[in-house]
Amino acid sequence: MRWQLSKPEIIPTSTQTMQEVVEKNLLVTRLEDLVAWGRSNSLWPFNFGLSCCYVEMATSFTSRHDIARFGSEVIRATPREADLIVISGTVFLKMAPVIKHLYDQMLEPKWVICMGSCANSGGMYDVYSVVQGADRFLPIDLYVPGCPPRPEALMYGLTLLQEAIKDGAPRQARPLNRTITPEEIQAFACRNMRDEKHEQRIKADKLTPPDEV
């Protein structure tokens, strides 16, 4: 079998003009769109959790759900290297200033996902010691309802956030007023990259030997 890394039709030949070669190898776009596309596909979550919902958040990092498919596999242990924080669990009054301090240390631009009923609105804890919604002291980009939400719900919320970043949603227009509904969670099917790229891999039957590249 012959090995080839590029399709024959896209390999420059002596008969092609410079314009034809450039058109096949260059992508023209706006710098803002390119940066937004890069940011949306390389979100770095901060490894931070508060309560029960963090268990579901951590489950999304496992191989079964594989959040790395959406470019968020680089889990950061420090807020100074993260640009996404998921408020997952009950926000107690004692933790509110700690969360705000962690948020202030994150890189700009930064995004916040509010995960679970307790983080969204206090949940069942309508008491003096629990903040009735993290949006009382943080700007929230996306709300994921549930008690607790499933990992699929968090990943679906992540895809919605990615689309908002790609579309260039202004940071000043927060919150985005976007709440995931149970119907959307149920209808959301986890993307299977293996099946999506199956036909593409099957067609790649001509590869160039490494010593001839």
From Swiss-Prot:
Principal localisation: membrane
InterPro entries, per database record: NADH_UbQ_OxRdtase-like_20kDa, NADH_UQ_OxRdtase_20Kd_su
Transmembrane regions listed in the UniProt entry: none
GO BP: aerobic respiration; electron transport coupled proton transport
Keyword Transmembrane appears in the UniProt entry: no
Cellular component terms (Gene Ontology): plasma membrane; respiratory chain complex I
Pfam families: Oxidored_q6 (PF01058)
Subcellular compartments: Cell inner membrane
Superkingdom field: Bacteria
Gene3D superfamilies: 3.40.50.12280
Cystine connections: none
E.C. number(s) listed in UniProt: 7.1.1.-
Molecular functions per Gene Ontology: 4 iron, 4 sulfur cluster binding; iron ion binding; NADH dehydrogenase (ubiquinone) activity; NADH:ubiquinone reductase (non-electrogenic) activity; quinone binding
Cofactor note: Binds 1 [4Fe-4S] cluster.
Coiled coil: none
Cofactor(s) the protein requires to work: [4Fe-4S] cluster
SUPFAM superfamilies, per the entry: HydA/Nqo6-like (SSF56770)
Keywords of this entry: 4Fe-4S, Cell inner membrane, Cell membrane, Iron, Iron-sulfur, Membrane, Metal-binding, NAD, Quinone, Translocase, Transport, Ubiquinone
Residues annotated for [4Fe-4S] cluster binding in this entry: C52, C53, C118, C147
Substrates-to-products reaction catalysed: a quinone + NADH + 5 H(+)(in) = a quinol + NAD(+) + 4 H(+)(out)
Subunit structure as annotated in this protein's UniProt entry: NDH-1 is composed of 13 different subunits. Subunits NuoB, CD, E, F, and G constitute the peripheral sector of the complex.
Alphabetical list of HAMAP family matching this protein: NDH1_NuoB
Biological function: NDH-1 shuttles electrons from NADH, via FMN and iron-sulfur (Fe-S) centers, to quinones in the respiratory chain. The immediate electron acceptor for the enzyme in this species is believed to be ubiquinone. Couples the redox reaction to proton translocation (for every two electrons transferred, four hydrogen ions are translocated across the cytoplasmic membrane), and thus conserves the redox energy in a proton gradient.
Family, similarity comment: Belongs to the complex I 20 kDa subunit family.
Xref: PANTHER family: NADH DEHYDROGENASE, NADH DEHYDROGENASE [UBIQUINONE] IRON-SULFUR PROTEIN 7, MITOCHONDRIAL
Protein name: NADH-quinone oxidoreductase subunit B
